[in-house]
Amino acid sequence: MRSWGSYRRGVVLLAALTLLWRGWTISRWSWDSDDWIYLADTESLGFWEYLWQDYNGHLMPAEFLVSWVVTKAAPLNFWLPVALASAGNVWLWGRALAALAGERLVLLAPLGLLALTPLMIRPTIWWASSLQALPLQITLALMVTAAARLARGGGRRDLAGLLLALVVGLLFWQKALLLVIPT
């Protein structure tokens, strides 16, 4: 039985479980290597210099913008933004799966795997890693949604959404360029 209401409730439930699961696991962790550098650089570098720095050969202004905002708002407390981004990631993948295959309850199984997999613990408890892994997943979910709509006869708005998602992903990490190879 297909029901958008049931599917939507399932996605919201999985996003809420992800928020709790990631919040709990992350709150029991401490900062790691690059995390301390990110934190120190928010104080030692100017705002624009911090955003546009060459960090080990990487240009990641959106990543550093998020890091700067979180550090200024709540220094040493990155668990809430990571947990919220993880839950948002699940919600966006719920939309992407529905765009690909329709609002089917069976899609909650792979979404649940994404939401609760232990494979995402390490990338999300390490602040610097989560600033790269989560935006890539979110970018891919947005691109899949836009590409599915384009394939079904979407217009310029969906094409613009696809390109905008890629640009935002690239501002977080240049490896987002690899997301367009499958499309």
Residue ranges, per PLM feature:
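Extracytosolic helix-loop segments that constitute the early lumenal/periplasmic catalytic or substrate-binding loops
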Residues: 36-55, 62
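Short hydrophobic/aromatic helix or loop-helix immediately within or flanking a transmembrane segment
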Residues: 52-75
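Membrane-interface transmembrane helices that cradle and orient dolichyl/undecaprenyl
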Residues: 140-159
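Start-transfer (signal-anchor) and selected internal transmembrane alpha helices
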Residues: 1-19
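Aromatic- and kink-enriched transmembrane "portal" helix at the membrane-lumen/periplasm boundary
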Residues: 82, 107-139
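Helix-to-loop transition at the C-terminal end of transmembrane segments
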Residues: 20-38
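Transmembrane-helix motifs of polytopic, lipid-linked glycan transferases
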Residues: 83-107, 142, 146
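Membrane-interface alpha helices of multi-pass inner-membrane proteins
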Residues: 158-173, 179-182
